[in-house]
Curated annotation (Swiss-Prot):
GO terms for cellular component: cytosol. Residues 92-136, 157-224, 269-527, 560-586, 629-788, 815-1082, 1097-1186 are annotated as: Disordered. It is found in: Cytoplasm, Cytosol. Residues 157-176 have a biased composition (Basic residues). It comes from the Eukaryota. Its main location: cytoplasm. This is Capping protein-inhibiting regulator of actin dynamics. Residues 321-472 are annotated as: Required for interaction with actin-capping proteins. GO terms for biological process: epithelial structure maintenance; maintenance of gastrointestinal epithelium; negative regulation of barbed-end actin filament capping; positive regulation of actin filament polymerization. Expressed in intestinal epithelial cells (at protein level). The lineage of its organism: Eukaryota, Metazoa, Chordata, Craniata, Vertebrata. The modification Phosphoserine is found at residues 7, 28, 132, 420, 556, 975, 1017. It comes from Homo sapiens (Human). Residues 200-211, 282-293, 302-322, 329-362, 432-447, 505-527, 677-707, 768-783, 908-921, 994-1040, 1059-1082, 1099-1124, 1151-1170 have a biased composition (Basic and acidic residues). It is linked to In colorectal cancers, CRACD gene is observed to be often the target of inactivating mutations. In the absence of genetic mutations, expression levels tend to be down-regulated.
């Protein structure tokens, strides 16, 4: 009861003592908290054991002055002790509070009583805590005052009022009346002193011991009565003390106020009196201090008088000063105004002069133009020549107004001769390039200059020359010529292709260019400089649900050497995303530090206009190029980002060439892209490009794909983003075509990485990739090879510009045309991805990097790589594939291949032997997509029939990548037949390809699973989830690794997935980052973190391999049982998504070599589908301004499952375990079956 009484007293009694206590507590709760803790501990001991240990009293209380109670502990009744303790505590607090209360406004006489009541609740927390902490929860007697209250609530006050309403009122009265007993304060204070000297711990035992006893309601009442009596006495004392304190405080406050007031007044007076009177004021300060000291004395009135006088003086002085200051300010203002007026007059005069000068200049220019026109009219011998060189002449004639008509004619003849020479040279070069095509690409990395002129460029140039005329050829005769013509080209572009021939003439002719032309050049240069200037670019990564995963992702570009070589530079732009791609090119590539744009979540990019992206590295990453400004005049140029980056010309060329030449080239590229678009690209592709990306994107894409590619022969851009629409044309044929294109592109990018390998090898490579299946693929791939991209499984979300794909260039003209269409669809589309719906025209980031809309394509020199990998199927041609693959998104796989040579070799082999496997594996998503996308499109045979399966087995490789986006919605569920037949065919194929690498077969299985999952992937989340699950299955370890890897850098996850599914990892890089990271990883010059990640992945792979082997053993058994069930199930339960995606995936997966475990794959696939369905919807980076196509949107949500969306943060071990458990549980039903 003592404790209870104490708490009530402190809380509810509003006497001075309580008030002072509470104010003190409010002012120093830290000390109270410490004391409370100690008190609680001791009380808990005493109460729990019911022992009276004289030492139980907390030191806390000892400080409070409880030592004085020691004498009474055993002499007095527990109630008395308790009340004494309460009194002592309150007194001690009052004592301690005297000083602070005197300072605090709370104790002012007016507010004292109110403040006391208000503040009082602060203290209760302490005693009540003691009691509640004591831990004795006695049987509660509601009639009695609550014994232990955990918190301050109304219950105590209610009980108090109910039990002793009168006494409480009396206590209030006492407080008012009992202001006399000031002497009690001394006694109270003396107790604390004794307490400090005494043994602080003896009171409490009795104090707390009383609490257990109050179970008796009667005893409790007695104690309460006694307590209340003592409380009243205590209240009286406290009130008296409070009154005393108030008086003292009032006096002190009054004195302080007086002093302050006097000082202020004196200061004012001193200010008024001025500096001269300051000495007397100082003299007065002594009396002031004396007055302050004797403020309480009667002499205070005199001080006030003096202060008044001083104040008056100070005020007068202040008035004088103010007047003076005002006068000075007015003078200053006048002077300033005069100065301003003078400046204005001068400016006006200058402006007038400038205007006059401008008028004169304009008049002179007009005269010059008139003269030029006259000369032109005279010189117009051959109208054609005049048309071609009309503008050049004007510039030259302006410069040489006095030149005669003969000179003008001579100039025209010179120009014609120069143009004809340039054209001849260009044609010769093209012929040479044609001859060197097979060799050229192999030599490409070594000879950037040749690369520029390699077949793709030659083809483009020829086509463009045929279409756009010889001027383009003249413009692009060579890097040197381009540079020479660069300054004039921007103008030429603006003026038209006809004037293309003029720039060289003008350069030679005009020592000083026309002012207009100079202005234009300066503008272009500025634009180029701006674009080439590496600038950090920041973007936000957000999940589909407006949740900002990364408020700021910084892209800081590393500026590449401008002179590294056009090809190198173009490759660099692409490499920035898949930096590994650049291993082929020794030249320093400009790789942004954040080559991985997608932070593990999705593409992080704010939806920005392409024009907003200034960083060349960024642009190259995004596939934007300098072209922007060049294209701007063209109208398509504004989109510049995708194509240019691809071409890399934006990045590399501008650096290599003068900015103006770069811009001119970009413009020409756009023009050529348009021409090529119309002529080269399939009508579908061109239409698609035009319709979907919009004219800008199409020209941009083509420009980039072709023009830039020409500029920059196959670049090692590993990843390209393909708009889903391009991947999956609206029609199945288009889809298949695109899939083939995509695949060919993937394969080509494989080539691209090792562009050196002949561009033509890609078709062979395609065949090699397909091996058996690839042959059917081969036919397709030739068309597709041009684009040479791979879809990273989930990287489609990754915004990666595909550089002009060397494979595209490499591809034979047939391929080039076919693939050019597909390329236009793929390559151009990739730049266009921004415009996937044609909506994106404006922003590269505008691309909703969602699996649905874009698939990231891993570009590989598939021909060379595949050939090599065929040769070294087990080795995986880590050398060729390693660097190129490393360069390519697969590069990671190759890295993996290097690390796991067999495992990777298989993945590589998959990449290559089943080039589609690689494509499909790498774009496991693409693979799943191809299958999932439209059953027919995935395979060249669009029929979902077993036929298709067979074709799929052969073709799926190519198809898978093409379908990588897997718009399963588009693809009708692959026919169960195809599913059924495919798995076996695929198994055979996968076994063939997979045999070289048993571990890859596991990955293949995983890939198969992933592809199976991905078939659901059309419900994008499933695919991603599938990937995750694959990763989870493959290595729950990988889970942590993989999610963290995405966070760390998709490399780990991608590699881990690679280890598990050698190919899939790339695709698996569910975070667009994965693909880029893979590429980075693969890059020969890997950052430390990449190598470390690879090492970790090796460990993961090994563990996963063992786990997967076990899993496969189990699953193989289950698969045999369930294979039939699975086929039916996948057809039935999978229904559209499973059968469609599943069958497609299976067909793709089988080609991937993952089919060997057909039943197992199906089981896993089913499990993953189930999981995917259960998994949260995807996280998407909503960067794009344009909305993805409806089906794409559906996929988008699914594509990025939240786990993938969260890739940014690594998965904690517990999360991986949880996922593992979830998977195990999800597998139970199948196991039971």
């Amino acid at each position: 009861m003592g404790t209870r009484a104490f708490s009530h007293d402190s809380i509810f009694i509003p006497d001075g003592g309580a008030e002072s206590e509470q104010t003190v507590q409010a002012m120093s709760q830290d000390n109270i908290l410490g004391k409370v803790k100690t008190l609680q501990q001791q009380l808990g001991k005493n109460i729990k054991f019911g022992q009276r240990s004289p030492n139980a009293i907390p030191m806390n209380k000892a400080n409070s002055g409880e030592a004085s109670l020691e004498e009474d502990l055993f002499l007095t009744s527990p109630m008395e002790i308790v009340t004494q303790q309460d009194i002592v505590l309150s007194d001690a607090e009052n004592k301690s509070s005297d000083t602070p209360s005197s300072l605090s406004p709370l104790n002012l006489p007016g507010a004292g009583s109110e403040m006391e009541e208000k503040v009082a609740p602060v203290k209760p927390s302490r005693p009540k805590r003691h009691f509640s902490s004591a831990g004795t929860i006695e049987s509660v007697n509601l009639d009695a005052i609550p014994l232990a209250i955990a918190r301050l609530d109304n219950s105590a006050a209610k009980h108090k009022l109910a039990v002793k309403p009168k006494k409480q009122r009396v206590s209030k009265k006492h407080r008012r009346l009992a202001q006399d007993p000031q002497h009690e304060q001394g006694g109270l204070e003396s107790r604390p002193c004794l307490d400090q000297n005494g043994h602080p711990g003896e009171d409490k035992p009795t104090w707390h011991e009383e609490e257990p006893n109050p179970l008796d309601s009667e005893e409790e009442r007695r104690r309460q009565e006694d307590y209340w009596r003592e409380l009243e006495a205590k209240c009286k004392r406290q009130k008296a003390e409070a009154a005393e304190k108030r008086r003292l405080e009032e006096q002190r406050l009054q004195a302080l106020e007086r002093r302050l007031w006097e000082e202020n007044r004196r200061q004012e007076l001193l200010e008024e009196e001025g500096e001269g009177q300051e000495p007397p004021l100082e003299a007065e300060r002594a009396p002031r201090e004396e007055q302050q000291r004797s403020l309480e004395a009667p002499g205070w009135e005199d001080a006030e008088r003096r202060e008044r006088e001083e104040r008056e003086r100070l005020e007068a002085e202040e008035e004088r000063r103010r007047l003076q200051a005002q006068a000075q300010a007015e003078e200053r203002r006048r002077l300033e105004e005069d100065a301003r007026l003078e400046e204005r007059r001068r400016q006006e005069e200058e402006e007038g002069r400038c205007a006059e000068e401008l008028k004169r200049q304009e008049e002179e220019e007009a005269e010059g133009w008139e003269e030029l026109e006259q000369q032109e009219a005279e010189v117009q011998g051959p109208p054609e020549a005049l048309e071609e060189t009309g503008e050049g002449r004007r510039g030259a004639e302006e410069e040489d107004l006095g030149e005669e008509e003969e000179e003008g004619q001579a100039h025209l003849e010179d120009w014609r001769g120069q143009l004809s020479e340039l054209l001849n040279d260009f044609e010769e070069r093209l012929e040479d390039q044609e001859r060197l095509k097979p060799e050229g690409q192999r030599e490409h990395s070594e000879e950037p200059g040749i690369c520029e002129e390699q077949n793709p460029e030659a083809e483009r140039r020829r086509e463009q020359q045929g279409r756009s005329g010889d001027f383009q050829g003249a413009d692009r005769p060579g890097p040197e010529e381009k540079r020479e013509e660069g300054d004039t080209e921007p103008l030429l572009k603006q003026e038209g292709p006809v004037e293309a021939a003029q720039p060289p003439v003008e350069r030679k002719e005009a020592a000083a260019l026309e002012q207009g032309r100079k202005v234009e050049e300066l503008r272009w240069q500025e634009v180029d400089e701006r674009q080439t200037m590496p600038r950090p670019y920041t973007f936000q990564v957000s999940s589909g649900g407006k949740q900002i995963l990364f408020p700021k992702v910084n892209l800081s570009p590393v500026t590449p050497a401008k002179d590294t070589g056009l090809t190198a530079a173009p490759q660099e732009p692409k490499a920035p995303k898949a930096s590994p791609v650049q291993h082929a090119l020794p030249s320093s590539l400009s790789v942004p530090h954040t080559a991985i744009l997608v932070t593990g979540a999705q593409l992080c990019g704010p939806a920005v206009n392409l024009s907003q992206i200034k960083d060349t590295a960024c642009k190259s990453l995004l596939g934007l190029e300098e072209k922007k400004h060049a294209e701007a005049p063209a109208g398509e140029n504004p989109p510049r980002g995708p194509g240019d980056a691809r071409a890399g010309s934006g990045k590399a060329k501008p650096r290599q060439e003068s900015p103006s030449s770069a811009s001119a080239l970009a413009e020409w590229a756009s023009i050529r892209s348009r021409i090529l678009k119309n002529a080269e690209s399939d009508p579908r592709s061109s239409e698609r490009d035009q319709l979907r990306p919009g004219d800008e994107s199409t020209p941009r894409g083509r420009c980039d794909s072709r023009g830039n590619q020409r500029k920059t022969p196959p670049v090692n851009a590993k990843f390209s983003i393909m708009p889903a629409w391009q991947k999956f044309s609206d029609g199945g044929t288009e889809t298949s075509k695109q899939s083939t294109e995509a695949e060919s592109i993937r394969k080509r990018p494989m080539l691209g990485p090792s562009e050196e390998t002949a561009p033509q090898p890609p078709p062979a490579g395609v065949r090699e990739l397909g091996k058996g299946p690839e042959k059917s693929e081969m036919h397709r791939e030739p068309a597709d090879t041009t684009e040479g991209c791979k879809f990273a499984k989930d990287l489609p979300s990754f915004l990666v510009p595909s550089l002009p794909y060397p494979p595209q260039k490499v591809v034979a003209h047939t391929e080039f045309t076919t693939s050019s269409d597909s390329e236009t669809a793929n390559g151009i589309a990739k730049p266009d991805p921004v415009m996937p719906g044609g909506e994106e025209k404006a922003s590269p980031f505008g691309i909703k990097l969602r699996r649905t809309n874009y698939s990231l394509r891993f570009n590989c020199d598939q021909q060379a790589e595949q050939k090599k990998k065929k040769r070294h199927s087990s080795t995986g041609d880590s050398a060729d594939a390693g660097p190129p693959a490393a360069g390519s998104a697969r590069g990671e796989k190759e890295m993996e291949g290097v690390a796991l040579k067999h495992g990777p070799s298989l993945p590589q082999e998959r990449k290559q032997a089943p080039s589609t496997r690689r494509d499909s594996a790498e774009p496991s998503s693409s693979r799943s997509v191809p299958v999932a996308h439209p059953g027919p499109p995935p395979a060249s045979s669009q029929t979902p029939a077993p036929e298709h399966d067979k074709a799929a087995n052969k073709m799926p490789l190519a198809q898978k990548p093409a379908l990588a986006p897997k718009p399963t919605s588009q693809t009708p569920p692959a026919s169960p037949l195809s599913k059924l037949s495919r798995p076996y065919l695929v198994e055979l194929l996968s076994r063939r390809a997979g045999r070289p690498d048993p571990e890859p077969s596991e990955p293949s299985k995983e890939d198969q699973e992933s592809s199976d999952r991905r078939p659901p992937s059309p419900p994008g989340p499933e695919e991603r989830k599938g990937q995750k699950r694959d990763e989870e299955e493959e290595a729950t370890e990988r889970k942590p690794a993989s999610p963290p890897l995405p966070a760390t850098q998709q490399e780990k996850p991608s590699q881990t997935p690679e280890a598990g599914r050698k190919e899939k990892p790339m695709l698996q890089s569910r975070h667009s980052l994965d693909g880029s990271k893979l590429t980075e990883k693969v890059e020969t010059a890997q950052p430390l973190w990449i190598t470390l990640a690879l090492q970790k992945q090796k460990g993961f792979r090994e563990q996963q391999a063992t786990r997967e082997e076990r899993k496969q053993a189990r699953e193989a058994k289950q698969a045999e049982k369930l294979s039939k069930e699975n086929v039916s199930v996948s057809v039935q339960p999978g229904s559209s998504s499973v059968s469609r995606a599943g069958s497609l995936h299976k067909s793709t997966a089988l080609p991937e070599e993952k089919r060997p475990e057909t039943a197992v794959s199906r089981l896993e696939r089913r499990e993953q589908l189930k999981k995917a369905n259960t998994l949260p919807t995807s996280v998407t980076v909503e960067i794009s301004d344009s909305a993805p196509p409806a089906p794409l949107v559906k996929e988008v949500t699914k594509r990025f499952s939240t786990p993938d969306a969260a890739p940014v943060s690594t998965e904690p071990a517990w999360l991986a375990l949880a996922k593992r458990k979830a998977k195990a549980w999800s597998d139970c039903p199948q196991i039971i079956k």
